[in-house]
Amino acid sequence: MYYPFVRKALFQLDPERAHEFTFQQLRRITGTPLEALVRQKVPTKPVTCMGLTFKNPLGLAAGLDKDGECIDALGAMGFGSLEIGTVTPRPQPGNDKPRLFRLVDAEGLINRMGFNNLGVDNLVENVKKAHFDGILGINIGKNKDTPVENGKDDYLICMEKVYAYAGYIAINISSPNTPGLRTLQYGDALDDLLIAIKNKQNDLQAIHHKYVPVAVKIAPDLCEEELIQVADSLLRHNIDGVIATNTTLDRSLVQGMKNCQQTGGLSGRPLQLKSTEIIRRLSQELNGQLPIIGVGGIDSVIAAREKIAAGATLVQIYSGFIFKGPPLIKEIVTHI
């Protein structure tokens, strides 16, 4: 497979520049016959989750295609689902560059992107043009300049705009790169948010005559008590699923490595064990009442199987995809 050569060239570039270059090429081919260049035939392995049928259990995690620009090209690679976003009500530039760093030896990434995106209206226009036949998740967040106490308004605005076009909606309250965002995972703040989201979901179901499930994406840095509390809230408010996990602030496994001191969320192989442990504990607390989408450091068939063994119904990749390329998709879907 050609990817090792492509990777070598891309890794000569600054990480964000490499991402932009790759997406430039994918944008050129998306929706054209040239999509055949990235198309991979993978086996169909249907999985039912949140009332939806996924053609296989592997998805692309949020954060790679923030604006839904390359849905068809990414879909052609064999993913059963794509989660686009995180998108916010209004466009925003994100944090200052540089804001994305490779930890090559650890096969990890640190990012402090800060929800850079072109806004929810732009994303919806891109979704309307796409022909992806898998499940499309849309991950939503709040604008940086929206006070945390008004944060739920941003989620409701986004829900309203994406509802008609989403297979499921992911609520991102766990990015470490938007000040105060993670506080929405705790106690009354979480309950208030989930009540508002559930009410909005019911209203939108009545308007659109279809039920779009909602999943909440959580952090890997929750202590035992917080994890129990989150699980309890998700069950009490009849949320449809949970995505575990986002990136970590923990640097214990990458001490001494180049870029390890950069602020932001760490993903990739160093997150693998931590996210699997959260999935395992969450699975015990949820007791089969709520499906888990497992994400965090999946870079092989074994890593994907470990997530499923810990309690995940579906799995997603991001950093592993950057380091291993499209062959990882085929490998996981074939052997999972």
UniProtKB/Swiss-Prot annotation:
Coiled coil: none annotated. It comes from the Bacteria. The keyword Mitochondrion does not apply. It is an enzyme of class 1 (oxidoreductase). PROSITE patterns: DHODEHASE_1, DHODEHASE_2. Pathway: Pyrimidine metabolism; UMP biosynthesis via de novo pathway; orotate from (S)-dihydroorotate (quinone route): step 1/1. It is found in: Cell membrane. It catalyses: (S)-dihydroorotate + a quinone = orotate + a quinol. Substrate binds at K66, N111, R112, M113, G114, F115, N172, N177, N246, T247. This is Dihydroorotate dehydrogenase (quinone). The active site is at S175. Pfam families: DHO_dh. The gene is pyrD. Its main location: membrane. GO terms for molecular function: dihydroorotate dehydrogenase (quinone) activity. Belongs to the dihydroorotate dehydrogenase family. Type 2 subfamily. Catalyzes the conversion of dihydroorotate to orotate with quinone as electron acceptor. Monomer. FMN binds at A62, G63, L64, D65, K66, T86, N139, N172, K217, T245, G268, G297, Y318, S319. HAMAP family: DHO_dh_type2.
